[in-house]
Amino acid sequence: MKTPPKVGATGEQRFVVEAKHAIDFASGGMPAVLCTPWLIWFLEHAAREAVLPLLEPGDSTVGTHIDVQHLAATPVGQAVRCRARVVHAEGATISFQLEAHDEHEVIARGFHRLRVIRVDRFAQRLQKKTNR
């Protein structure tokens, strides 16, 4: 990583909830709504967007902690905006405040921490696990 991001730097992801983003265990008339795992996926990618311009070739990021409150349901067809704001950066570890809104209200708030890693070193460690 060239330099750590500045506190206040943001990343954003926008999407429209599709059927593939809806809970898959709905039955008995349960409406199709955005499921929490997909919401977290978009929130994590918003955080990554804040860091991408600072990565060197061969760098990537991995999530190390996430804490999300899914506050409100969002139906299929609604637009969602996920935003991550840097609240702390120390070395390769970066912490974010998360928030997501649909067209009507805040649907999620939380905290995420990621770490910038060297892909080659990460792959080597993984290979050792595979070879056991």
Regions found by a protein language model. Name each.
Residues 14-18, 69, 113-115:
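Generic structural detector for well-ordered beta-strands
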